[in-house]
């Protein structure tokens, strides 16, 4: 079954730049898909359209049975609650510990304290940071910070994980660690992963 389906999608910005032209694709549930391309090839635009930060100029985008392109603004938050998003720049809150950064994603959706604690510890364990729960972001390496960002993205058990160049700021060794974490999430949890990158 397709979790993502794009049909004849175009994205042209107001400055006249066409980021995506006539893109059609489908991604099956449980897949791990890479979109590889150079800078300015529309990779990040694709990710942004999937979580509705951007709208297509033309075409249809369906995520989990929802036509994202036609989704009303007030319903976008419901879509995003079903997604996990990992960015290149981690976006951790510097004054919060590893545990608090991951738990924050549960708190904003109104989860109980018990559910928040249980799911947060599980997500931190999955990314291999059980011994760092009380550390702050500035006490972690770049690879560890990205693992915290991944834990935060998966804590609510999303069906789809969108990764926008998650290894872009990391050296090759740390990049391999992050790829291993993502592969484990895909294999063990069955999470569909769409990752955009300029690396082969």
Give residue spans per PLM region.
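Catalytic Walker B motif of ABC-type/P-loop ATPase nucleotide-binding domains
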Residues: 161-164
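Conserved ABC ATPase "signature" region
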Residues: 66-67, 103, 107, 114-131
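Helix-to-loop junction immediately C-terminal to a conserved catalytic motif
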Residues: 51
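Short coil-to-helix segment of the ABC ATPase nucleotide-binding domain corresponding to the Q-loop/switch region
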Residues: 96-104
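Conserved ABC transporter NBD signature motif
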Residues: 59-67
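Conserved ABC ATPase signature
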Residues: 136-140, 144-146
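Conserved signature/switch motifs of ABC ATPase nucleotide-binding domains
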Residues: 135-138, 155-156, 189
